[in-house]
C-alpha cells in the first residue's frame, strides 16, 4: 500500500470515526441534557461519563482528519490547508468546553443532587451553545467551505461531492448564525434541512477514501506550492 493510499485510508477511517463518536456519545450522555430529570437521578452518571469520553475521542478524530490530510492539501494551497487545521482546532475547542460543562453537571448531581438545579441548567445551556458555534458553525467553515474548496480544486474527491461540501458548508454557517441571531430555532426544521448536504459530504469523506482512495491529481505528484 502506497503512502497516499494509506493517507486516504486513515483520513476516511477518522471521518467515519467522527460519526461513530458523535452519534454514540450523544446517545449516551443525552440524559444529562435534561437537567431537571438528570439531577433528580434519572439517567446514569456512568453512562453520561462514557458518552463524554466518546466526545473526547471525537476531538482526537476531528483534529486527526486535518493533520493527516495537511501534507497533501498544502500542495494545493498552503494557507487554506492551514486554515482547515485551524478551523478543526476551533471546533474541537468548543466541543471541549461542552464536555467540561456536562462533566460539571455530573459532578453537581453527585455532590448536591437537585439542590443545584439552576447551576446545572446554566451549564447545559453553555454546552448547547458550544454545539451551535462548534459543530453548528465551524464545521461548516472547515469541512464544508475550506475542505470542499480544496477538494474541488485539487480533484482528490469527485467534484460533484465537493459541491455538496461547498453548499452544505454555506448552509451550516448561515443556519448557525441564524440560531445565534434568533432567526432560526435551535434544532428547528431550517437547521435540520441545512445539515443534509453537509451530512452527505462528510459521510462521503469517510466512505470514498476508504474504498477508492483519492482520485488522481497533479498535487499528488507536485511538491508543496500555493495556488
Positions of predicted regions on the chain:
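Hydrophobic, aromatic-enriched alpha-helical segments typical of multi-pass transmembrane helices
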Residues: 1-227
